[in-house]
């Protein structure tokens, strides 16, 4: 009997080929993982590098230099007056009340000067440790707020953005009460970030931050931020039970603490109390008998460009990427900026360091979408930072050689004109720090 040929020989051969192919590939398929199922490669993280960077930015600047800032001699005189037995609640300079520095700063500066001078540091450097402490508190508070609101990486980015702002350099390295303001703002921001997880800690931080603000730039700034906190539930993002409990606790902490200073000042120096009440109760806005306002918005906007760069640029990038009113931290940052800008616009005092009020929310906004920054924009900011601070470093080294060794001659001539009484004096510790960090910085900006 003749064998009947297959009706579909091409299909049979194709099925056989598919079977052979399946048998050979199936072992490989067992090890295949779709791209969306693969675990992302964990980047190597070195948190200690951030601490080292903050140390390099913050610590060396307080050592081995005289009172450079024009306000530093008065602050130092207030600290000396307190050490010699002056009124703890009323800083004084040459026997006159001095309201431009917080009593809290005077207390802490006096403590460090007594504890560290002269065996560990000179009197100026020891007093500046108060600035180091309050600046560190502010950076920690802002960084932890970024971590709670946005995530761990963004918390570090908040700190990096802050220390990258030129406006923080003076308040973070010189004698003065602005570091207390920065610490208080950092505490407030951190308190807001904890309202959903740690109510008691959030209330303590907010209350203490408001009280510290009332002792620094006056009661008006503290009252403005307290009213801002009360208005946040107008947004549905903040209509949560835990936030209401936090507000009650924060006011229970803040109001008694804020009443301590006027009560103590009245009972220790009634005349100084009435001067404070009538002329300094609201800080730059005056007091109960001298409240005054002006239109200063153009001045502050002009100085904001250099004071808060790159924070404001990164904040604008974030605002263009997401709808801020749909995020809890976005509503907070926008409300904070609105209150601060309103106060700055109406302030009768044109003092550029008041722009410090804007740095925490701008840094928080800037860190939110920092990872999504386009390559071209990121490269520009990187180039701008390298060129700006690189040229500044070159100028400082040239100035050092000109003032101490007479080279370059033209620059040495100008240095002698502006500082005719300068005597060449090279301190070992600053030289060690400068010679250590300069090659490290050059290596960091040239590595691939």
Residue ranges and their predicted role:
Residues 17-59, 245-253:
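Start-transfer (signal-anchor) and selected internal transmembrane alpha helices
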Residues 42-72, 235-236, 252-266:
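Transmembrane signal-anchor helices characteristic of membrane glycosylation enzymes that use polyprenol
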Residues 43-50, 142-164, 182:
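Transmembrane-helix signature of polytopic, membrane-embedded enzymes
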Residues 57, 74-100, 104, 111-114:
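Extracytosolic helix-loop segments that constitute the early lumenal/periplasmic catalytic or substrate-binding loops
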Residues 75-81, 208-209, 215-329, 333-352, ...:
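Transmembrane-lumen/periplasm boundary regions of multi-pass, lipid-linked membrane glycan transferases
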Residues 124, 167-181, 217-218:
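Short acidic/glycine- and proline-prone juxtamembrane loop motifs at membrane-interface regions
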Residues 125, 129-149, 187:
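Transmembrane-helix motifs of polytopic, lipid-linked glycan transferases
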Residues 147-153, 185-205, 210-213, 322-323, ...:
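Membrane-interface transmembrane helices that cradle and orient dolichyl/undecaprenyl
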